[in-house]
Amino acid sequence: MTYDELKTRIADYLNRSDLGNVIDSFIDQAESEINRKLRHKDMIKRSTAVLDNQYSQLPGDWLGAINVDLQTGDPVPLFQKSLESLDLYRNSIQNTSGQPKYFAIDGDTLEVCPTPDQSYTIQMTYYAEIPALSSTAVS
């Protein structure tokens, strides 16, 4: 089914022909709701990044972490903490640098602790947003 066919079916289901302008908004809202609630194996993605400071940008389609590993020969898992717990831990080690052990998510940013003492490659396994439909991205 194409995007235009979906819009036609929605209008037919509602038995309204005057909703052409709001059906796009209806589809956007449905996609947002699906991305908030659905977690399916087909949404799982992997991404690597170089971690050389306390913060790293998350992928643009990030919904939630499954796991984050340092790629140092054998993968070394980083354990997720709340931002508050990460700050408390950072204070307890007097903000020393070292191999990261923990991570927290702050919006679109990954924060690690301790602050990396060198560049590390990390692999992030995460749930990704379902690509949005539009008149140009029809399936």
Please state what every model-predicted region is:
Residues 1-139:
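Glycine-enriched, solvent-exposed interface loops adjoining structured elements
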